[in-house]
Amino acid sequence: ESLEVSTGRFKGVPLTAELFARAREEDPDAYVIAHVMNPEEVDLCLLHKDSAIASDAVLRGDEGHPRAAGTFPRGIGILRKAGLSWPEAVRHATSRPAEMIWHRGGRIIEGANAELVVIDPDSYEDRGRFGAPLTAPGGVKWVVLNGVIVVEGGEIVGPSSGRILLGE
């Protein structure tokens, strides 16, 4: 009961040995979600001063894990609830992950990529759910990627101009 098919023909069905064999035959590209993380342990790990908010979520079209869209508001919310200031909590989702892959990003400094997210702190929240993993987080007002406005007034207005970051 801790494994669930998250995409394709058997989406939402608990994975059994029988279903696994059938899915490999009939829907070999289906993804599976393992519901094995203990929320209290995740929260405890996030509170470490060197933790980074990141996700391994994989999407297939509009199917997959809700952390695909909700990782950052959920993680920042956990840190804020634990008493971290906004700058401290945001650092766990910006400059800290960048430092971990030896990347210059995640900071507002001269020479860095123009990547900014403007949020309403009172309504910034994870809204993603199983069955609707791409539900946009609440409270995201503006997003600028590589100098291009892609979210304005909470609405997507341009194509993504982001790129995959690899350790340098």
Where in the sequence are the language-model features?
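Acidic/polar loop patches that form or flank catalytic/metal-binding clefts of enzymes
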Residues: 86-91, 151-152
